[in-house]
Amino acid sequence: MRQLGLKVKVRRAKYKAYKGEVGKISPNILNRNFKATAPNQKWVTDVTEFAVCDDKVYLSPIMDLYNREIVSYSISLSPNFWQTKEKLQGAISKLNKQDTPILHSDQGWQYQMKSYQKILQDNNIIQSMSRKGNCLDNACMENFFGRLKVEMFYGRTYTSVSNFVQALHEYIDYHNNKRISLKLKGMTPVQYRNHSI
């Protein structure tokens, strides 16, 4: 293989947020019903990890299932509660008074915390969780992560963490404002949301 200039890509171990039951597990209310008829009805969230320049970078977005828009996200060098809180507050700031979205996640430790669940309750957000070890229960977010990593991470070298973080910001802007989708009638996620208002 070396003589042909071929290299093997080895996948690193995936980040696992599940640390057992450290708090309350919510039922799977979303139950793989990924269709929403209006903005802010159904949101999904998760955390993914990137190894960049001997560091780890964690991305945690919230996606609206109505138009697949990333309504809020946070980037951190460690998976911590403040990252979860930051992205949640960003999403809450976009809610209308009458909105009561379902927010679906896996059973990661941060989603089991009382302080996280209190923020949801205080803002009329209904918590939903995937069954343990079942990534298909959050397939839309897993699909987003997979596409993101193929398009801007795998096979690329970043010279610094800050360059990579900038590339993440640019990718999410591209996803929301430039990437058209046949499922959205040839519009971008932001155009589709604006068209529905």
How would you name each of these model-derived features?
Residues 1, 30, 46, 62, ...:
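Mobile genetic element proteins and their domesticated derivatives, centered on retroelements
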Residues 1-38, 134, 188-197:
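Basic, flexible linker segments flanking DNA-binding modules
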Residues 19-21, 105-107, 113-114, 129-149, ...:
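RNase H-like two-metal-ion nuclease catalytic core shared by retroviral integrases
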Residues 26, 40, 59, 80, ...:
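Hydrophobic (often cysteine-bearing) scaffold residues that line and stabilize catalytic clefts
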Residues 36-71, 77-81:
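An active-site-proximal beta-strand-loop segment
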Residues 67-73, 127-130, 154-155:
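Short small-residue beta-strand/loop micro-motif enriched in glycine and branched aliphatics
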Residues 74-97:
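Active-site beta-loop-alpha junctions of metal-dependent nucleic acid enzymes
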Residues 114, 121-125, 147-197:
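C-terminal domain-tail junction helix/linker
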